[in-house]
Structures are given as structure tokens and as C-alpha cells.
């Protein structure tokens, strides 16, 4: 029995939603904007721009100017210090550390529980749903998914918040049930020292039936090369014969394609690009 065929049926409702927003993107965006302005109306930011009187996109466009990170940074710093209800009504304790592109300094982006559930985790579910639609004979759930992420740490300036790579925040807050189908353990996954982490992941996952990979192409390549080095194998499918898909994001995979062809030689391997950033989950490959 292919258990993946059974479990993948639970993703059918998401496929209907995906088809809907693919055909009605504009209308859905307007509804989302209305919902967000209503929810944030009583925050300090919402009161500043009178969110409660915004009725449509035109109102929002005229009322709220485009702003840089530096302009909202004072709000972010106050959130990091423990203040709440500034930009969003629910408690903010997590901050995704994003590399700056304008002033070479890291940006700290607030991550709410709604952002985790309604954006990042939902985006991951959508990526899986689309993959199962395109590959109905998948054996994805016959093994475990190897997820390679970053790390997090307490905010050095405050006891009220935690800072880390988005991938680490996702691993830290994921539904505990997911831990039964993913490797490595959370303790190993969130290690901060890179070389020690790669070694620990390789040692703990080599004996496992890994069917999928998720992570940044450049990071994953380092791990794959370490696994091959430790096992003496020439190709990753010799270590994990049921490996079938790599969900990759963070950076473009194109510069690494040739290297991946050398370490994963089976033509059955699938590559699914996801556009997930600290700011949100923006898209998933659909072919």
C-alpha cells in the first residue's frame, strides 16, 4: 500500500484554494488587504494611518506611503524591547534576521503567529499539494524529509524576543506531529556551529530512509558532499535510494544545477523551487 496516496488526499482542499487564487488573484488580494487593515486598526501603526476608515485599496494607497525598513525600524526596535500592539495586534516575540541589501546591515523582521500559520506553513503545504498533483505516484511519506535550516538565539538586547534565520523559526515552531516525519532532530537542526551541525546531521541521517530534501541549495550541497564523503558513495541515491524531491529556496538553484547533477544522478529526482523569504511566502513552482 502506498501511504502517500492516502495522506496526499488531505491536501485536496488546498488544491481547490490554490486554483481559486490562481484565477481570482486580484479579488483575493483586495479581501486580504481589508482583513489585515481591520485586524491592525487598533495598533499604534493602524491608528496613525486611521486604518479603521480604510474601505478599499485606493484609500490604503493614498493614506499609507511606501516606506523603507529604516523608516519603520524604530517600531521594530521597540518590539524587540518588549512593547506590543505597535504594528500588529498579536504578541511578537520572534524576529527573522534578514541580510540587508541597502546598507549592508541585517534587518530584523517581526514574525507573528499568524505569519507562521497563514503564510509560511501554508506555503509549505501548498508546495506539497502541488507536488502530489504533478506526481501522483509519489512515495513521499514512505520515508522522512531532511530539512536543513539555520539557527536562532536570544536577542542580545532584550529578554523579550528571539532572533534567528527564518528556517530556524519555522523548525522551532512547527507542529510537533511534523517531527515524526522529518530529520534531523530539533536539537541538531538548531545547532549554531555550522561544521558541528553538518557533521551531526550527516551522522544521524545516513541510516534513515530519506525521501525528500528541503533547504537552501548552497547549504544542502555542503551536506550532500559530507554524506558522500562519509559513506564513500558516488551519488546520493546510493545512500538514500528512495529520495525523490528537493524543495529548494533562499537563493537561485541555477548556479548549482551542474553540481547537483554530479551528486544526484538519478533521472527520477525532482526539483521544486519555492520563493520563501523572511518577509513572506511568495510562490511555488507549478510544473
Residue ranges and their predicted role:
Residues 1-287:
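Active-site phosphate/ATP/adenylate-binding loop shared across adenylate-forming ligases
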Amino acid at each position: 500500500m502506498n501511504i502517500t496516496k492516502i495522506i496526499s488526499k488531505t491536501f485536496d482542499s488546498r488544491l481547490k484554494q490554490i486554483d481559486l487564487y490562481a484565477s481570482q488573484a486580484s479579488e483575493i488580494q483586495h479581501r486580504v488587504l481589508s482583513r489585515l487593515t481591520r485586524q491592525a486598526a487598533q495598533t499604534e501603526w493602524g491608528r496613525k494611518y486611521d486604518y479603521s476608515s480604510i474601505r478599499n485599496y485606493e484609500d490604503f494607497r493614498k493614506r499609507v506611503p511606501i516606506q523603507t525598513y529604516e523608516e519603520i525600524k524604530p517600531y521594530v526596535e521597540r518590539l524587540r524591547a518588549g512593547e506590543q500592539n505597535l504594528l500588529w495586534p498579536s504578541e511578537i516575540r520572534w524576529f527573522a534576521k534578514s541580510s540587508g541589501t541597502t546598507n549592508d546591515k541585517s534587518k530584523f523582521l517581526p514574525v507573528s503567529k499568524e505569519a507562521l500559520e497563514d503564510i509560511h506553513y501554508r506555503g509549505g503545504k501548498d508546495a506539497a499539494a502541488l507536488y502530489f498533483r504533478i506526481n501522483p505516484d509519489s512515495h513521499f511519506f514512505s520515508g522522512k524529509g531532511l530539512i536543513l535550516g539555520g539557527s536562532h538565539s536570544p536577542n542580545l538586547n532584550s529578554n523579550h524576543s528571539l532572533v534567528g534565520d527564518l528556517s530556524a523559526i519555522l523548525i522551532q515552531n512547527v507542529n510537533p506531529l511534523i517531527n515524526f516525519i522529518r530529520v534531523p532532530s530539533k536539537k541538531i537542526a538548531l545547532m549554531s556551529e555550522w561544521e558541528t551541525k553538518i557533521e551531526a546531521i550527516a551522522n544521524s541521517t545516513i541510516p534513515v530512509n530519506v525521501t525528500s530534501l528541503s533547504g537552501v541549495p548552497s547549504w544542502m550541497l555542503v551536506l550532500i558532499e559530507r554524506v558522500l564523503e562519509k559513506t564513500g558513495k558516488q551519488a546520493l541515491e546510493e545512500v538514500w535510494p528512495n529520495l525523490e524531491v528537493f524543495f529548494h529556496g533562499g537563493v537561485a538553484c541555477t548556479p548549482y544545477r551542474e553540481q547537483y547533477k554530479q551528486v544526484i544522478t538519478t533521472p527520477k529526482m525532482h526539483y521544486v523551487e519555492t520563493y520563501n523569504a523572511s518577509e513572506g511566502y511568495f510562490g511555488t513552482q507549478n510544473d
